[in-house]
A protein has these predicted regions:
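Short, solvent-exposed loop/turn segments that connect beta-strands within catalytic domains
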Residues: 51-54, 165-166, 243-247
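Phosphate-binding/switch region of NTP-binding enzymes
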Residues: 67-69, 73, 77-78, 191-281
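Alpha-helical scaffold elements adjacent to nucleotide-binding pockets in ATP/GTP-utilizing enzyme cores
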Residues: 83, 118-126, 154-158, 192-196, ...
Length: 285
């Protein structure tokens, strides 16, 4: 074996030893449940000690990712605004039942589909819903103008730059994840993007929310990319229009690694802002 081969073998062994240290799980060590980022309502649990405790039902936890799927024009971006508003202000008037646990973390929204004007209008909804412009932890980017590889690289760069500046990443929105690949049916690229998302959630201890279309005529997310998201996501959220309720969008938990959150509806208020339905609400517009 040449010296060069020995060096390569040594580097390989060191790399595998590092992976072994990072990935080994001690079954006798207590690992805490990942902290909740955004939740909908709560549940009561009886502990092994017989104590009754109330816990938030997660939509997403830190260190994991979720994705929203729906057919075109099902108000996916409005729902993203609803989650973002709840994350920025859990006591808002539009987000009944939704809670968040932001503490001092940052909220970052990457839009890949819309031009600057439409993107800004979406980003500003959170200001309008909370009647404030004092959101210095809220970072917004419209990435339509750059290529899919540059989008991946920029997201990675920006998350790292915030971390290097001493910031803690909280929730990251990527609306839409299909624009991080050349084709949602490209197996290699789809796998790479989902692996990237999983790595980012681990490295930055954040929750990532992605958005993807459903296939025409089915409830499956688009392409190989959608299949990879289904396999790896903590929570799969589905939006559907309810023909029996005026203007309502039904939000359901299609899959979850946690207790599934309860189905709920939202619709636009008289100002065109998304609002969770309350039983006492009366809609006449």
């Amino acid at each position: 074996m040449s010296e060069e081969q020995k060096e390569e073998q040594h580097e390989h062994i060191m790399s595998m030893q590092l992976i072994q240290e990072e990935c080994a799980i001690n079954i006798n060590e207590k690992i805490e449940h990942p902290p909740v980022a955004i939740s909908y309502k709560t549940k009561e649990v009886v502990t092994r000690d017989g104590e009754v405790k109330e816990f938030p039902i997660p939509i997403g936890t830190y260190g994991n990712f979720s994705f929203i799927q729906a057919h075109p024009k099902s108000m996916k971006t409005f729902f993203v605004s609803l989650l973002g508003s709840a994350y920025c202000n859990p006591n808002g008037t539009h987000t009944s039942g939704l809670s968040s646990f932001r503490e001092d973390r940052e909220y970052i929204h990457f839009d890949t589909e819309q031009g600057d004007w439409h993107s800004q209008r979406v980003f500003k909804r959170i200001q309008w819903m909370n009647k404030t412009s004092n959101l210095d932890f809220y970072h917004t980017f419209a990435l339509r103008k750059i290529g899919f590889r540059d989008r991946i690289n920029f997201i990675e760069y920006y998350l790292q730059s915030l971390t290097d500046a001493g910031k803690k990443i909280g929730v990251v929105v990527i609306d839409g994840v299909a624009d991080l690949v050349s084709d949602a049916n490209n197996l290699e690229e789809s796998n790479l993007v989902v692996q990237k998302i999983m790595a980012w959630t681990t490295i930055y201890d954040c929750h990532i929310i992605t958005v993807i279309h459903s296939n025409f005529g089915s409830d499956k997310p688009t392409g190989h990319l959608g299949s990879f998201l289904e396999k790896k996501a903590e929570t799969q959220i589905q939006l559907e229009r309810d023909p029996n309720k005026l203007g309502a969008i039904t939000v359901s938990c299609k899959r979850s690694r946690n207790t599934p959150f309860e189905q709920f509806d939202f619709r636009l208020d008289e100002n065109g802002l998304p609002k969770v339905d309350n039983p006492d609400d009366v809609y006449s517009f």
